[in-house]
Amino acid sequence: MKSKLLILCVFFSVGANAYTCSGKVKGVSIEAKTGDVLVESIGPLSWPRLCKVDSEYDGISPEACRIVYSTLLTAQSTGKDVTLWFNDSKDCSAASHPSWQWLTGWYFGPKLSV
């Protein structure tokens, strides 16, 4: 019984810190001097800095970043929503993810809506 309760607590503690941010994509861009991918908006997120197309950053390779960039361009041009997954204790607010700063806690996505 105690082991079942422990497992249940672990699942709840992991789930309590996970969240998603979803929405339309607008203004996909690359900062010319740094290679940083920025987006004017991804749903509620304003000007998040996601990754670098020319070097690894926070475990994201340039190749993976180019796929992220391509997915965001596809979402922007088709008007489809995307979803990003996070595993920190924040939310999708501007207070949690200030404009022009690197996204924290982002671990999966963008996933293009069907």
Model-derived regions, located:
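Exposed beta-strand/loop interface patches that mediate assembly or binding
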Residues: 19-114
